[in-house]
Structure formats: C-alpha cells, structure tokens
Amino acid sequence: KKLVDRHSNTNLALNLHPKQLQHPSTWTFLDNISSMRGNVSIELTEHCCEFDPADGADALQTYISNMKSKGFSLAIDDIGSGQNNFELISKNVQNIHTIKISLLDFRNTNEDSMFFSLNNWLNFSNRYNLKMVVEGVESECISNKLKNLGMVYQQGYYHGKGQVLC
C-alpha cells in the first residue's frame, strides 16, 4: 500500500505462478490489495502446474474468472511458453485484458516468420479488444518495425531496465 501511495501514477504488475492460485493465502492477499486494483494488474506466468483433481478439470479457468470478478486486470505472460498458449487464451478471452508475447521465443526464427506470427496475435487481440504487449524489444530497429505494424505496447531493455521503487 505504501508503495502504491508513493507512486500513485505508476501501475504495478504482480506476477503469479499458477500454483499460487491454489493457496488460500494468495486470495487473502488479493482481497487485501483489492482497493488498489486500479494500479495493480496480475500477470499469470507461463509455468505449468498440476492442479488438485478436487478443484476440477477447469480449475485454472475458474481461478482466472475469480480474479476478474475481484476487479483485477489480468495479463497472460509469455504466450507460447509453458501452459500459456492459444487454447488458454481462447478459453478465457472474456476474462483477460492483456496478452504478452516475448520475442525471445523467436530467437531461432527468421524475421518474416516472427512478424507473421506477431501479426496474427495482433489481429486476434484487436478482434477481442485485448491489449498486446511485445516483450524482449532490444533495439530501435525492431521497436520501429513493431510500431509500424501497430504494435505500440513494448517492453524490453531498449526501453529501459527495471527500476527499484522501494
């Protein structure tokens, strides 16, 4: 709370491992910070996770829906890695706000294929009114090419390193 108060114009992203969603303490924490939900978005990391069978086959979808119902903006991080794939996005499109795609996943791909794939994700995000962030932007050249294609939300060392706020 103190951090958000000191940096009231700053939005914070809280990364959650899917396994954390099984713990009641996570939900208590989210309840405790719910008054700050306008400044806090939740990023669901790509880590694969086995959910307790008692939670049901659609446990992750239920958790995602619960975060949305608490008023949090939800981002799916590192699309194409781990469990964060098209199937997860398409099943939860009504409950997510942002998709994040890392250029690191395209290291061994030619640039044309990379931009083709990114363009498909951009079309998908536009269709469903999702914000799309391209992560791993490390040069002005790539940044400008992305902007020219309409990919204006970018993250990476080209734009600056992370900052300590405390």
Residues covered by each model-derived region:
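Leucine-rich repeat
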Residues: F29-S34, Y63-S65, I89-K91, W121
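Conserved ATPase "switch" residues in P-loop NTPase domains
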Residues: K68
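EAL-family c-di-GMP phosphodiesterase catalytic domain
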Residues: P18-Q20, E43-P53, F72-S73, D77-C166
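Catalytic core of bacterial c-di-GMP phosphodiesterases, primarily the EAL and HD-GYP domains
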Residues: K1-Q61, F72, G136
